[in-house]
Structures are given as structure tokens and as C-alpha cells.
Amino acid sequence: HTRALVNKAFSRPVIAKYEELIRELASEILDKAFEEEEFDAVERIARQLPMRMLARIIGVPDADSDWLVAKGDELIANTDPNYTDFVVDQVDTNEFRLMPFRSPAGKDLFEYADKHLSRIRERGEEENILSMILQPTKEGTVMIESDSQNFFCLLVAAGNDTARYSIASSIK
């Protein structure tokens, strides 16, 4: 049932609507990076672009983008003390056993998702990827709250991991 809810939101016509927004964001990030004579392209471009783009297409306020990037790092790099204070193989993770990646970042993202998704449901008129996913299918199927929170975390994890490393590996 989840696939039917997600397919429409990530269809080519829907994503095409974000092309200009994505171009503007990419230009903004590149312009800021190129202000410096030298910079770490992975940090300044590959780390920033996917999460900031994701934030915009799912309706997360720009003011929360830095937080989302940091939580994405904590979630995915949960074995690296450079990215998280909660290194999973060095601490008791039982408290977070039901959270993505057994991480407190998963809990933080669940709580954020709950508030963000509630705002989207209350407003009802927003046009973004998450608002589309929250809409019932033709058959009346809706994504339940826990699935919505998990999906939000999945988007953060995928945006932070797959897209970042794809961009990083393409930079020469």
C-alpha cells in the first residue's frame, strides 16, 4: 500500500516541478562554496545539496535545514565519533532499539516528523512531496502515522547517504 502512496509523489512530472527550485539551490550552494579560494567539495557541496534539496521538496523550513543535515549525519554515521556523540558500538542502544539505526537521531527525527507532518495535515493545502504522500489513494488507503514517521526518516537517510556519496564520487 505504501508504494501506491509514494509512486505519485516521486513521479517524473511531480519532480519536474522542482527543477527550478533545485537549480536555484544548487547555484546558491556552489556560489557560496566558490567564494573561497579552496574548499572541501564533499563538505560544502555533496553534504549540503541533497539534504537541503530534500528539505525544500518535503516542505521543511529553510531555517531547519542545518539541523536536518546534522541529524542525517548522526543517523547514518552512527559509528563515527566525528558525526555523533552516540556511537552505537560504544554505548547501550537498547533505549533506541525501535528507532532507525538504534540512534537518538532517529528519535529526534521521529519527533520532528510528527510535528512537521501534523502541520502539513492541519494546513492541508501545501504542495510538497510529503503532503502528496499523506493524501489517500483512489482506493482510500492512507499512510498511518508510524509509517509516515518511518518514511520521513527513510528520506533523510537516503538523501544523506545515497545522494551525498553519488555526488561526492562524481566530483573530480
What positions do the PLM features span?
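Cytochrome P450 catalytic-core helices
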Residues: 130, 147-156, 160-172
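Cytochrome P450
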Residues: 1-4, 15-24, 35-52, 60-67, 88-111
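Amphipathic alpha-helical interaction segments
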Residues: 21-24, 48-53, 67-70, 128, ...
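Cytochrome P450 catalytic core segment centered on helix I
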Residues: 29, 70-141
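Hydrophobic mid-domain F-helix/FG-region of cytochrome P450s
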Residues: 4-5, 26-64, 72-81, 114-117
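Amphipathic, well-packed alpha-helical segments that form the structural scaffold of globular domains
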Residues: 3, 7, 11, 23-31, ...
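Secondary-structure capping and boundary motifs in well-ordered enzyme cores
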Residues: 18, 42-47, 105, 140, ...
